[in-house]
Amino acid sequence: MKYFVVLVVLALILAITVDPSDAVFIDILDKMENAIHKAAQAGIGLAKPIENMILPK
């Protein structure tokens, strides 16, 4: 979650400070942010069933 927040803040700073011609960097950061978010969701999706097997209710 910390990485997600850092990437969002960096994207906002770049969006405010760069010219439209430099928007490629923002696009790259946005793609990295989406990839990290999807990986985190997949990790949580995999961890929950394993956690339920180890620690039954």
Swiss-Prot record:
Pfam family, any one: Cecropin
Q: In which tissues is it expressed?
A: Ejaculatory duct of adult males.
Biological process (GO) annotations?
defense response to Gram-positive bacterium; innate immune response; male-specific antibacterial humoral response
Outline the inducing conditions: In response to mating.
Identify the GO cellular component terms for this protein.
extracellular region
Q: Which residues form the signal peptide?
A: 1-23
Q: Where in the cell is it found?
A: Secreted
Q: Which controlled-vocabulary keywords does the entry list? A: Antibiotic, Antimicrobial, Immunity, Innate immunity, Secreted, Signal
User: Family per UniProt?
Assistant: Belongs to the andropin family.
**What is the documented function of this protein?**
Male-specific peptide with moderate activity against Gram-positive bacteria.
What protein name does the entry list? Andropin
From which organism does this entry originate? Drosophila sechellia
**The encoding gene:** Anp
